[in-house]
Amino acid sequence: MRKVIISVIAVLALFLSKDAKAQDSSYDVFNPISKYLALGDADKLSAWFSDDLEITIFSNSNDSSRNQARQIMKSFFRSYTPRSFEITHKAGRSNMKYALGTLNAGGEMFVVTIFVNYMDKDYRIQHIKIERPS
């Protein structure tokens, strides 16, 4: 009986820790997103996409499915091979956050804005915007 109770507590702790991770103020959703932007890995980046999101590249804005957005990002990364990405500013509330960053890709610098929303027990990218600095 004691083993059953310990097993139940362990399983509950696993489920609760996943929810707590996203809401924990020390958890930074932008760490993995930044990593995949710097690597130019559209496949891994798209795991963070919402099912439907807005993607804007150089003033061309599209409401896209996750798969469409992945293809758009793959095309961008083919044209502009990333060398580095650095977050320069972050803000938001517990369920909505945004970050501004600088992407060095293809010999150019780009300003990247990322909006994430807490949905279905995890953060998802709702909008990603890539622009040339003005």
Over which residues does each language-model region extend?
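Exposed acidic/polar residues on beta-strands and adjacent loops within beta-sheet cores, strongest
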Residues: 25-28, 43, 88-95, 133-134
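Short, well-ordered alpha-helical segments enriched in acidic and aromatic residues
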Residues: 41-52
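Surface-exposed, charged secondary-structure patches
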Residues: 70-109
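A short gly/proline-enriched turn/hairpin at secondary-structure junctions
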Residues: 54-62
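Short, low-complexity N-terminal intrinsically disordered segments enriched in polar/charged residues
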Residues: 3-4, 8-35, 47
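Short beta-strand edge/turn micro-motifs at domain boundaries
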Residues: 109-134
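Stable alpha-helical elements in mature extracytoplasmic
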Residues: 26-29, 33, 41, 68-73
